């Protein structure tokens, strides 16, 4: 298996794409030595295509709870009884304050995240107003995660300074119906295609530990490659009491590392981003940066606590990596 892994690494470094069957063979790694080689090769691929820079992003839970959708993993779904805090859209002042604090800490990206299938009406207009002000007052790169949107809405976001749009596929097409029934996989794909058409970068990934097979993860990795995802957040399920997945079994550390490494093999040039559930990974995912990861959400997540920005910066320095410098383009002033 080690020689096969090295063979694939060599081909990828020559910009030859890995095939689905080859990726599936990598998923069969079980011996400790094979997993170490898989991670080492993924790290080499990361270094070759992406260098030593780590992309840091932060998110703000800008509207929480009462979601109409039935995603089985989600604390914010109105279908389940969880202890999540419910509140309407945050104020412009709150968003500006957090964005400024994060920018001062050296974070590259800042995103508003809202609950619900897709933000609409007056709330969408308010979000646009917030982004206009963020773009005017800050140098941090702006991202958005506002659910299923139309092309025209995405164009308006871009005009307000947003450069990347986040919309997870969550899992493979084949497994999706097991975790959500209130909207289709194709609606998510359509949103991502609209993101691309609008000229925004795509941030899309998924959650592992939903009960999916490794084949589902590999299928997701290839789907994201097809969609040209620039940033691929990988979440580890953090089971929430009151949701259908509250008793989901915990993933092993090796399974998490294997998943991240294979995503790097398939998506050699993307930001492979540690996201929710980092607290379930040893050392808040430190070893993942030796397995192909080169980005992370830092600070708190939507409904759970994350790692402090200062601690992530220390970890990145310890690993002899560098925080990516902000490359925000000349902004249009409003």
UniProtKB/Swiss-Prot annotation:
Gene Ontology BP term (one): biotin biosynthetic process
Catalytic activity: (4R,5S)-dethiobiotin + (sulfur carrier)-SH + 2 reduced [2Fe-2S]-[ferredoxin] + 2 S-adenosyl-L-methionine = (sulfur carrier)-H + biotin + 2 5'-deoxyadenosine + 2 L-methionine + 2 oxidized [2Fe-2S]-[ferredoxin]
Keyword Magnesium on entry: no
SUPFAM superfamilies xref list: Radical SAM enzymes (SSF102114)
Any one GO molecular-function label of the UniProt entry: iron ion binding
Top-level taxon in the UniProt lineage: Bacteria
Function: Catalyzes the conversion of dethiobiotin (DTB) to biotin by the insertion of a sulfur atom into dethiobiotin via a radical-based mechanism.
NCBIfam families xref list: bioB
Protein name: Biotin synthase
Organism: Clostridium kluyveri (strain NBRC 12016)
């Amino acid at each position: 298996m080690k020689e096969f892994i090295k063979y694939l690494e060599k081909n990828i470094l020559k910009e030859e794409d890995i095939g689905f069957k080859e990726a599936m063979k990598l998923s069969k790694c079980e011996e400790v030595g094979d997993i170490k080689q898989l991670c080492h090769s993924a790290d080499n691929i990361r270094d070759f295509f992406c260098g030593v820079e780590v992309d840091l992003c932060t998110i703000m839970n800008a509207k929480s709870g009462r979601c109409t959708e039935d995603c089985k993993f989600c604390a914010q779904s109105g279908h389940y009884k969880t202890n999540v805090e419910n509140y309407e859209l945050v104020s412009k002042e709150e968003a500006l304050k957090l964005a400024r604090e994060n920018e001062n800490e050296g974070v590259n990206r800042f995103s508003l995240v809202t609950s619900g299938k897709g933000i609409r009406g007056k709330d969408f207009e308010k979000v646009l107003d917030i982004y206009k002000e963020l773009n005017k007052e800050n140098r941090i790169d702006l991202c958005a995660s506002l659910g299923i949107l139309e092309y025209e809405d995405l164009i308006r976001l871009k005009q307000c300074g947003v450069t990347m749009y986040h919309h997870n596929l969550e899992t493979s097409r084949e497994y999706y119906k097991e975790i959500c029934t209130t909207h289709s996989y194709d609606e998510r794909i359509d949103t991502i295609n609209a993101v691309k058409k609008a000229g925004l970068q795509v941030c899309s990934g998924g959650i592992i530990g939903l009960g999916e097979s490794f084949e589902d993860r590999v299928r997701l990795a290839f789907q994201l490659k097809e969609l040209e995802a620039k940033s691929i957040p990988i979440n580890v399920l953090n089971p929430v009491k009151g949701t259908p997945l509250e008793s989901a079994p915990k993933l092993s550390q090796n399974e998490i590392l294997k998943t991240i490494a294979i995503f790097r093999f398939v998506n050699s040039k993307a930001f492979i981003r540690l996201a929710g559930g980092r607290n379930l990974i040893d050392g808040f995912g430190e070893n993942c940066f030796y397995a192909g990861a080169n980005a992370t959400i830092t600070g708190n997540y939507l409904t759970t606590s994350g790692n402090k920005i200062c601690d992530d910066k220390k970890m990145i320095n310890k690993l002899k990596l560098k925080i990516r410098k902000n490359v925000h383009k000349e902004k249009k002033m409003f």
